[in-house]
A protein has these predicted regions:
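N-terminal intrinsically disordered, cationic/polar leader segments
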Residues: 1-99, 109-141
């Protein structure tokens, strides 16, 4: 089943840089909250939130949290109803998770332009390592 959707909006929930420099080593990337999924049933919207920290020797030098909102078409939403749930397939979550992660990467690039933190590029994350199951949303009538 092909799921029709649109990337409806992006919310920068948190962004901060702290003392430190990306030129220091070792530079490490850690996902503080990883990828979290949520939904707005009435709006037929899936929300993917990416949280990440950049650390140097256990000191956070940058933190970011971005929520991406994906509006599902009414026909696709209805087509995913199964046994009292709207079941969002994990393969679709991989797709929109990847879009969300790439969006976060782009925001970091834009927010750090002209600083030494701009040399940091978030690594590729394989969505099957952070999303393990379909999303099951109880039907609300």
């Amino acid at each position: 089943m092909q799921i029709e959707f649109k990337y409806s909006h992006i919310k920068l929930d948190q962004f901060a840089t702290f003392n430190g420099t990306a030129n220091q080593r070792p530079l490490a990337f850690q996902t503080s909250g990883g990828i979290q999924t949520g939904f707005n049933y009435a709006a037929k919207t899936i929300i993917i939130t990416v949280s990440a920290d950049v650390k140097v020797e256990d000191q956070i030098i940058m933190t970011i949290k971005v929520s991406s909102f994906f509006e599902i078409s009414p026909e696709s939403w209805e087509g995913m109803k199964e046994d009292g749930f709207v079941v969002i397939p994990k393969d679709f979550l991989y797709h929109i998770g990847g879009l969300s992660f790439s969006t976060t990467r782009g925001i970091i690039f834009a927010k750090t332009e002209g600083t030494d933190l701009n040399s940091f590029i978030m690594p590729v994350i394989y969505m099957d390592q952070v999303i393990h199951a379909d999303m099951r949303i109880p039907v609300q009538e």
